[in-house]
């Protein structure tokens, strides 16, 4: 009987561990606002850059819960939180506007004890554990070894001080990759008018750079997360609220799972949104291309915006195409092609010309025409 109970208990533990490892970030989640390239937020403490972000992008304390059980209900008279997240097409950065009211701001110590905005980001939605505490082989790998060899690599955790006491770093990067919190990978600015122990409102803007692989050896051996429209990422945060006591007075979590801080599968889903319509023209023209290696063949791809019914490509060599995404083989090795795409539709037309971007050379079958 005892043996049967032991086997049952072991099976239950295995099932519980398996269920936890199978947690997936699949719910609808939240939106990340795309800033136009001409309205990138300046990290300067002037928050008017964020006025263009609709309220639909706000994530309030209503989406959070105190997973310590100290607070069953939200009381905005003691703590209130609102966060907006943004991105810019072409930059692998996540921008944050953090606004909070607290009836007791706790920030007079030099250690980790501090009112804290803790964020965790998983830029490629890879999921899984990323702190030494949750290493998968604790019997053979020491926790300190896991810290240096594993922690913060495929997902990153930041403990942002809100605010830091004088002389203390603005954030604790929870891993050996301390370069993550410095320019050009991060920047920050605060605005507040209160002292330790007082009530008041804090606003903070900052950006971070998510990494698919953040190497302990430095950024030169790391891989940034590539951000693009409609990409879905893992992102989560918690607000650790101290009120002058040794223990915190709440761990206000955006995730349903307390251990989201070290397991990226417990984060929330965020989608990098396209530009809002008010920041776009009715018809916009753009295109990209890929050269087939060691040939003069180029694959062109239309990236235009709006209702478009016709395309006209001028490849810069006297030939044209009306396909949307043509493939063209040049007869000549050349580095000075001027390629133009013109698009038309019921709401207008637009043109995109790129000068000397398309360069081709076939080493196996060089053209006889002189380059110049």
Feature annotation, model-predicted:
Residues 1-26:
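Bacterial Sec-dependent N-terminal signal peptides
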Residues 2, 8, 244, 338-340, ...:
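A detector of low-complexity, intrinsically disordered, Ser/Thr/Gly/Pro/Ala-rich segments
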Residues 4-5, 86, 327, 356:
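Residue-level detector of intrinsically disordered/flexible regions characterized by low predicted structural confidence
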Residues 12, 54-55, 59, 345, ...:
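Residue-level detector of alpha-helical segments with a strong bias toward transmembrane helices
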Residues 13, 38-39, 112, 310-312:
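N-terminal hydrophobic or amphipathic segments with adjacent small-residue motifs
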Residues 20-289, 365-368:
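Structural preference for beta-rich elements and adjacent junctions enriched in aromatics
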Residues 277-372:
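Extracellular/lumenal mature domains of secreted and surface-exposed proteins
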């Amino acid at each position: 009987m005892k043996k049967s109970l032991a086997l049952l208990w072991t099976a239950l533990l295995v099932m519980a561990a398996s269920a936890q490892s199978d947690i997936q970030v699949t719910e609808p989640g939240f939106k990340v606002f795309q800033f136009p390239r001409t309205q990138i937020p300046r990290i300067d403490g002037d928050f008017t850059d964020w006025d263009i972000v609709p309220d639909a992008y706000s994530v309030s304390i209503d989406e959070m819960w105190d997973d310590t059980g100290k607070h069953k209900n939200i009381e905005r008279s003691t703590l209130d939180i609102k966060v907006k997240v943004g991105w810019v097409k072409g930059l692998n950065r996540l921008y944050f506007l953090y606004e909070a009211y607290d009836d007791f701001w706790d920030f007079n110590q030099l250690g980790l004890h501090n009112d804290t905005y803790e964020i965790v980001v998983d830029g490629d939605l890879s999921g899984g554990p990323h702190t030494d505490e949750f290493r998968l082989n604790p019997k053979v790998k020491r926790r300190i070894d896991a810290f240096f060899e594993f922690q913060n690599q495929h997902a990153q955790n930041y403990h942002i001080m809100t605010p830091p006491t004088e002389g203390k770093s603005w954030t604790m990067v929870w891993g050996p990759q301390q370069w993550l919190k410095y320019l050009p990978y991060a920047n920050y600015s605060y605005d507040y008018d209160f002292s330790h122990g007082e009530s008041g409102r804090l606003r903070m803007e900052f950006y971070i750079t998510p990494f698919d692989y953040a190497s302990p050896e430095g950024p030169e051996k790391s891989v940034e997360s590539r951000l693009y429209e409609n990409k879905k990422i893992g992102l989560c945060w918690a607000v650790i609220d101290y009120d002058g006591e040794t223990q915190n007075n709440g761990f206000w979590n955006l995730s349903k799972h307390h251990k989201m801080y070290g397991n990226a599968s417990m984060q929330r889903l965020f989608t990098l949104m396209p530009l809002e319509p008010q920041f776009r023209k009715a018809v916009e023209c753009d295109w990209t291309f890929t050269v087939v290696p060691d040939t003069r063949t180029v694959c062109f791809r239309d990236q235009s915006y709006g209702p478009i019914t016709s395309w006209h490509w001028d490849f810069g060599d006297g030939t044209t195409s009306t396909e949307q995404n043509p493939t063209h083989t040049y007869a000549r090795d050349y580095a000075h092609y001027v390629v133009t795409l013109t698009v038309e539709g019921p709401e207008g037309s637009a043109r995109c010309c790129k000068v000397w971007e398309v360069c081709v050379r076939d080493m196996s079958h060089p053209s006889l025409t002189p380059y110049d």
